[in-house]
Amino acid sequence: MAKVESFTLDHTKVKAPYVRLITVEEGAKGDKISNYDLRLVQPNENAIPTAGLHTIEHLLAGLLRDRLDGVIDCSPFGCRTGFHLITWGEHSTTEVAKALKSSLEEIAYKTKWEDVQGTTIESCGNYRDHSLFSAKEWSKKILDEGISDKPFERHVVD
């Protein structure tokens, strides 16, 4: 079986919340795709409940696209501690951390239920499992801790 980088990361050494560049892959025509680890809570110490994580996912899908060029996808980790962000091209971890911070600020302090995309039976595969309240509370907690652009030391972005 192929080795997966995320499973070789020593989860006891990272200091969440942070943004980490996992890899940059280059296609046959030279196009680059980057994969980032957006770690919102400390692994094996906490996990975001599914309803809040699900709502954060739906909101980040739009908010990160508003802030970063080339966003392909933002998908939650099964462990519920953060997200993979996949983009065309390369962004610095500082740029991604600032976009994430700004997005979480919007979730925490401005977002209303009407702003959450994909919350109907037609538009979501598990539309009943959402909580804007939880998304807001977790966003505030993450923002209070500060988002670092380095995974192994705290270097909080402004």
Curated annotation (Swiss-Prot):
Transferase among keywords: no
Keyword Transport tagged: no
Annotated catalysed reactions: S-(5-deoxy-D-ribos-5-yl)-L-homocysteine = (S)-4,5-dihydroxypentane-2,3-dione + L-homocysteine
SUPFAM superfamilies named in the record: LuxS/MPP-like metallohydrolase
Residues reported to bind Fe cation: 54, 58, 124
Cofactor: Fe cation
Gene Ontology MF terms: iron ion binding; S-ribosylhomocysteine lyase activity
EC number: 4.4.1.21
Database matches in Pfam families: LuxS
Family annotation (InterPro entries): LuxS_sf, Metalloenz_LuxS/M16, S-ribosylhomocysteinase
Superkingdom of origin: Bacteria
Record note on cofactor: Binds 1 Fe cation per subunit.
Biological process annotations from GO: quorum sensing
Coiled-coil spans in chain: none
Keywords assigned: Autoinducer synthesis, Iron, Lyase, Metal-binding, Quorum sensing
Function: Involved in the synthesis of autoinducer 2 (AI-2) which is secreted by bacteria and is used to communicate both the cell density and the metabolic potential of the environment. The regulation of gene expression in response to changes in cell density is called quorum sensing. Catalyzes the transformation of S-ribosylhomocysteine (RHC) to homocysteine (HC) and 4,5-dihydroxy-2,3-pentadione (DPD).
Family: Belongs to the LuxS family.
Self-association and partners: Homodimer.
Protein name: S-ribosylhomocysteine lyase
Organism name: Limosilactobacillus reuteri
